[in-house]
Amino acid sequence: MNKPFLILLIALIVFSGCNMRKYFKPAKHQIKGEAYFPNHLQESIVSSNRYGAILKNGAVIGDKGLTQLRIGKNFNYESSFLNESQGFFILAQDCLNKIDKKTNKSKVAKTEETELKLKGVEAEVQDKVCHQVELISNNPNASQQSIVIPLETFALSASVKGNLLAVVLADNSANLYDITSQKLLFSEKGSPSTTINSLMAMPIFMDTVVVFPMLDGRLLVVDYVHGNPTPIRNIVISSDKFFNNITYLIVDGNNMIASTGKRILSVVSGQEFNYDGDIVDLLYDKGTLYVLTLDGQILQMDKSLRELNSVKLPSSLNTIVLNHNKLYSLEKRGYVIEVDLNDFDSYNVYKTPTIGSFKFFSSNRLDKGVFYDKNRVYYDRYYLDYNDFKPKLYPVVEKSASKKSQKGEKGNAPIYLQERHKAKENKQPLEENKVKPRNSGFEEEEVKTRRPEPIRDQNNATQQGETKNNESKNAPVLKENAAKKEVPKPNSKEEKRRLKEEKKKAKAEQRAREFEQRAREHQERDEKELEERRKALEMNKK
């Protein structure tokens, strides 16, 4: 087959598949109003991660809003914000200095370094490029405002506890430094990872161990208290080749939740639970986990990853904010989704309009810098605070009438058609009672039919009397039956609520059975492992 034709055919298949993708387009009656981003930033967002964002003017937004930190323009290095931890702003920096052989003076070599990278001359680049982490105190009265620690390669995530700095580097190495002496206390490198998700989790210090979120889908647990730092456990979450870094990590007492883009792991009092799916983002709050998936699902789970509630939308969701018992998420085609945490079946959709001459979503797609914290969502140079969420509500729009109602059925017809039917019904008896012409030829027959028939004999009369008495006796029974028939049917809302409660009850029973089954499986597995170890010990003794 001709090679250009084959390439063209493949391209057509790919683009046709892209064109068939369904985008979120809610019906008019689903859009409740408009959600404005009324607050302005000085500049637009240039870069962001899970813990902060940098604006064009160097200002930094953290999890509590705009910080006092300003990253100035420096031609000798490039800085990126990693995290705010234990009173320090942590910055990762790439040095771009070049040493001139003739004058031994520093010169900017950013363009040359880029060219060398493109050519693949790694040795020359290493001579001219350096990497470091800078810790800047958020206390203006601190004795030492800045601490710089040199690194072997670029830092992706970091956190501080006391005098220790835990860093995960771009070569998938976990490092532990003494901040005062800048001494490397521990380092372990994993398998390299070529592509990673920008939502990178940070290391977490616990009482005696530090948990490193690695780039190859595992958690490295290092004991830093008892003697020299020593790795004591490797927890493999996922083994995918691409985008397999740990994107979320949180510790809550004896419970830990971690996630990659494909799997969630929950450790509850030593027991492990997994959930597999295409995971966009997640948020843990007060013992409950909220998950966004690639196919538009919003899931509510407990610690053992049992599904409590869910709603599926044909949408591409981004950001999770919980406020006033509601979950808010930003849809990439220009909508704010509001889900009631008490009733996942009911959700509201708000459209994000244009702001002045600035089109909020260019090409109806979320394609600019985004960052969110506990109460706010930042987009480009605007942000929405859900503590003061006041959408502009539209007038209530009813659902479009069905085909049957459009044909004119009384039960499901629109109100104005029902009124017409009522008018017709009221007119019909008037037409029957109209005075007919006297010489119509039917008068005599009508008069005859109206006359009561004479009672032919006494027996018939007594029978008629008995039937009347029986009718009078049966009258209460008939009234009772009529009353039973007239008992109003349960309201559709009540019926819906009852069915929903039954469904929830059945779901809860099913979850309880699944939980018991998992617990039994874990217990059997542990017993099996103990038995195998016991046998192995006996064999070694022999």
Swiss-Prot record:
Biased segments, Basic and acidic residues type: 418-435, 447-456, 481-542
Record's subcellular location: Cell surface
UniProt region (Disordered), positions on chain: 399-542
InterPro entries named among the record's database cross-references: PGBA_C, WD40/YVTN_repeat-like_dom_sf, WD40_repeat_dom_sf
GO CC list: cell surface
Chief localisation class: other
Polar residues bias (residue ranges): 457-467
Role summary: Binds plasminogen, specifically, and in a concentration and lysine-dependent manner. Plasminogen is the precursor of plasmin, a serine protease that cleaves fibrin, fibronectin, laminin and vitronectin. Acquisition of plasminogen/plasmin could enable H.pylori to degrade host components.
Other facts noted in the record for this chain: Plasminogen bound to PgbB is capable of being converted to functionally active plasmin.
Name assigned to this protein: Plasminogen-binding protein PgbB
